[in-house]
Amino acid sequence: MYIPNSEEFLKGIKEYRKYEKRDSMYKVATFLVSHFWGKFADMSDGLGVILLTWNQAFYRYGLLDFDKLESFLKDNFADIEYFRKRNIFSFEANDYEKIKNLFNELLIATGINSDKSDSKTSPVSVAKSLHILCPEFFPIWDTNIAKSYGYNYLTSPSRKYLEFSRDLKELANKIKGYEGYPLDRPLIKLIDEYNYSKYTKGWI
C-alpha cells in the first residue's frame, strides 16, 4: 500500500478544499444526522443530502427510497451507535461480522428500482452513509479510490470494504504523527480528501 509523505498528504487536503465545492453538503449532512440523532426519518433525510449530491450519478437512474433507509436505521441503531463511539484505530477482526451485516443491509436500503441501469445497488452509497453515521470509524471510497487500493467491489463488496478499512487503519496509523494537517475533520475524512484529490481527480 502506498503511503504518502506529510507534504503530499497535506497538498491533497489543500487541493480538495480548493476545488471541491460540494463539500458543504458534508457539513449539512453531518449536522442533520447529529442534530436529529435517534429520530430516524430526519436522520434518513440527512443521509439523503450526501447521497443525492456525492453519488448523484447513481441516483439519476432511480429514486432513493427514504422509507427503506429509515427502516435500516431503526433496525440497526444499536450497532450504529456502537461504531459511532469508536475511531478507525480501534478497528479489529471482531468487528467483521457486524460491519458485514450493516454493509449488506445498507446496500439494499440505499439501492434503486430502475430499468435504466444494470446496477441496482451502490457500494459507494453504503460507504458514504456509514461514514456520515460513524465519521471517526468508517472510511469513504469511490470506484477510483477502491481500485487504487486494489479493490474491485463488483463482487463481494462487503468483504472488499472490510479489507479496505483494514488498509486505512494501517494508513491512519502511519500518518497520525504528521504535523500541520487540519483538525476540523476526523482523520479518516482527511484521508478521503487526500484520496479523492489523488485518485479520483488527479489534482496531485
Regions found by a protein language model. Give the residues of each.
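An N-terminal alpha-helical hairpin/helix-loop-helix interaction module that forms a charged
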Residues: M1-S117, P135-I204
